[in-house]
Amino acid sequence: MPLPDDVTNTQMVITKIKNFNSFRRLTLILYAMSVLGLSAQETAIISSDPLPQQNPLVTKAYELLELGDSAEALIHFQQALTENDKDLSALLGQAMIFADLERHAEAYATYDSIVANYPRHAFAWNGRGLAAFNMEDFDTALNSFKQATAEQPINGFFYESLAWVQMCRGAFSEAAEAAKIATLMYNKRGENSAYPLLIAYFAYLEAEDKNNAQASLNYAVRNKPLNTWPSPVIDYLAGNIVGCELIGYVQDSTQETEAHTYIGLKLRAQGDENAANKHLEWVARNGDRRVFEYTLARALNLQDSLALLSP
């Protein structure tokens, strides 16, 4: 699935800023804290001044983001950070832009700086985890996602992120459990995402728990999105369409990456390793790096290669 999800992901936050027509200077900090996941305790500390003063450079940077000029916005955020390297709004803006540009090491360093100063900032922990995940540092990603869920437990995307990294680590039972919680948390907030159900399905299959795998797939079929992706993926897994038909529904590189990944995972579960590897290797070489499935395919390929080298 694409990494963005509502307000819990950097790209979607940038999109929201771009489309937030009533974005005003005096609401900037409180908007950033409420949208980006600062804990209630830290919100109370930072917002104790009834009229928080915003660095004009940061204000201008967010205005530039709203206009879609992320390059100039980044310059303004960095100028603001030369004046105050702990400016939360500037750090968040810089981190979001680095993530959007796939400059993952710099995004990680920025989010790491945020959690060093604001250790209960759930969004920053999740952003730190996403950056580590994209660099395939799964242990660091795991620890970061666990921190995010601890600080903001009613957040489906944080648990979904946790499930993805557990899949990449080969911890399939833990991945299934995190995916199950993700679905519950999405439902609690009136949100929907089919991806935790897909994760749970394959995690249970990898853990050889066919009953729970089938239950996850049945639930996905009953609750699949109408006439929108990834509904064709669910139809494929349920046996209603074949692989070439699934590919026929693809409209962009992210969907193509997902389609090949799920075809590969299904073939893998059926024991057809050669056919599965063709799809997973295609994803690892040609897939869209912006989606979780790209990294999962690479991780599974590595696990299989290491297994072959084991005595």
How would you label these PLM feature ranges?
Residues 62, 96, 130, 164, ...:
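Residue-level recognition of tetratricopeptide repeat
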Residues 52-83, 93-100, 259-266:
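Alpha-helical segment of the N-proximal tetratricopeptide repeat
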Residues 83, 117, 151, 185-189, ...:
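Structural marker of alpha-solenoid helical repeat scaffolds
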Residues 66-67, 100-101, 134-135, 168-169, ...:
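Register position in tetratricopeptide repeats
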Residues 53-54, 88-89, 122-123, 156-157, ...:
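Helix-start (N-cap) detector for alpha-helical repeat units in TPR-like alpha-solenoids
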